[in-house]
Amino acid sequence: MTEETMIAEIARTLGIRPAQVQSALSLFAQGNTIPFIARYRKEATGTLDEVQLRCIQEQYEYEQALASRKETVRQSIMDQGCWNDDLARSLEAARQLQDVEDLYLPYKPKKRTKASMARDAGLEPLADCFASQDPKGPAPEDAALAFLSDDVPTVEDAIQGAANILAERFSERADFRRHLRRELWQQARLTCSLQVEEDQAGPMLTYADFSERVARIPSYRILAINRGENEKKLKVTLKEPADRHIAMLCQLVITRPSPYDQILRDAAADSYKRLISPQMEREIRNELTAQAEKQAIDVFAENLRHLLLQPPFAGQIILGLDPGFRTGCKAAVISATGQVLDYGTYYLTHSEQQKHQSAVSLANMIRRHGVTLISIGNGTASYETEQFVSHLIEAYHLKCRYVIANEAGASVYSASDLAREELPDLDVTIRGAVSIARRIQDPLAELVKIDPRAIGVGQYQHDVNQKALSAALDQVVTSVVNYVGVDLNTASPALLQHIAGLTAATAGNIVAYRNENGPFQNRQDLLNVPRLGPATFTQCAGFLRIKDGTEPLDNTSVHPESYGLAEKIAGHYGLSHDELKDPEKLAILRDKIQMNAAPKLAASLGAGEPTIKDILEELRKPGRDVRSDFPKPLTRRHVLSLSDLQIGSVVRGTVQNVVDFGAFVDFGLKTPGLVHRSQLSRHPFRHPTDVVHAGDIVEAEIISVDAARGRIGLSMKKVKK
């Protein structure tokens, strides 16, 4: 396949123009990153976004792998002297790696099989005789007599050996496998049965006597079934009409009446049962798992993206609480800039005396430091801690509220090398409380310090391919960090290393330079950082912000290469470069700017319209944090209990997690309520993430309460918007 053909195929698959694909591939080849291309090369790519660019990259890699595999297969078949025009055409037409493997199967070197042993015994000519289906050929027994030997002592052995060769040949027919694959995907059913007693089955009891068409099984069910099978609790099989498929194979391989009909029928049945069906079952099971894992990874990535985009509670003094029963609740107060001001351990669930002492101490700590928000981790003893805090606020008339924070990964961070470096004087348990406070103060800055897999906002995350999961989540972190941008003078190395063009080493060099030379005054200072050259500067500069520096445009996402253009646009509205620092002048500019003026400005300034629009947006809202467009976590002063709930009442809460079957909503109880996908919306949708995202604030009606099991059913369909 030529490069031009490959580009055309990618464009067709993604529904974009070949020129866009070509431009994106050229930019990749020049070493440009996806965030940089998406933000600053819109004219070149026709405004392709990050998702489209990543699809181009992945599809191109697939097409290259496909072309490489085709060449390997072609060379192998040629070396065997079996290459022909039909194979050449079929291989050229193959669009999937599976199609290539089907074509290669008859020529692929094999392990020792029944068929290979029969060939070694010299029975291939007898198999050819049967396959010829000569109506006037000798009887099978007579034909077999010529092949008797020490290895083949009887006529029955000879016929069976030849039949084994035929069975293998039939199993390698690409046309039948292709047709059968389509049939199985449309008609086959996945069935389960219990392998243990019902009282030992646990959640797998749901899948006792389970049967569903493979084309309809949702991904979370596939992963649940796989888990049950791995735990030896379920027996899983693919149920399909084998007799009909054997008849189809017989129709394909028996082309005319001959003395060998029964041998061919028996060989076809053996081929299907022993070779084809098990192979197809493995293939379909593997493909179902691959699709389910991809869906699970996509859901995790979508949830993670919205968690990272949660707005910060900037400028607030926050008390972080890491709840616990036996070892007590760890507390840490952080300043408006995230510095640790105070910390301690309190026993909120022990004796009344200890609870009273803890209440007095915590109330004093809150007043002493002017705490405005309390962040409570949602792990063990979270509900009990929430009850304590709610009572504390009311009893001591404290002027603060509390919020429940997702503490997943806090313990991982607190024991990490990074935590020891950042908080060397604090015990590992106190570091967890600091992290819980910081992840509310600035979720993005804190969560990037943790392996995203540990954040736990997915479904069956431990059952999927961990390498693929890590790659997908790392892409999300990188995408969000660059979308938001970071403060060059306060960002940690953990945050900086996700900026386009930067690595852990260059991020460390930036922080070292900052520590030695003081705050960066402008983006050009980056070129003084060791091992940060012009190419890296081009990639990263637009995503790094400097507040109160010498260049006002450094606090925007305008790239330095477009500063001249930005100044011309400001001049068009009557502002000089220096006036861009004046808040009053900027307010006047904001009122003057009209986004529909972009086409005329682009024409008069000889620039691309997408870049003009981006600059106008930045001049309207310089220094804006894009996370402000998203809802902040819900804060509370009072706690709910099951006894407070009534069917039909409406509650307000925060979406904790979105999965294939619905969304879990925290509205102040010990366990979150479930909005099943059937209760999410009156309008049709493909996936729950089309309706809600992790971190969203929603209202829902209580439709069921199971006090014994602690389950609450919610509906968003019945709530008036």
Predicted stretch roles:
Residues 1-22, 29:
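Generic start-of-chain signal for non-secretory N-termini
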Residues 40-42, 131, 241, 323, ...:
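Short, ordered loop/turn segments at secondary-structure junctions
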Residues 76, 90, 100-104, 228-243, ...:
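Structured, non-catalytic alpha/beta "coupling" segments that mediate domain-domain communication
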Residues 549-550, 554-721:
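Single-stranded RNA-binding regions, centering on S1/OB-family and related RNA-binding modules
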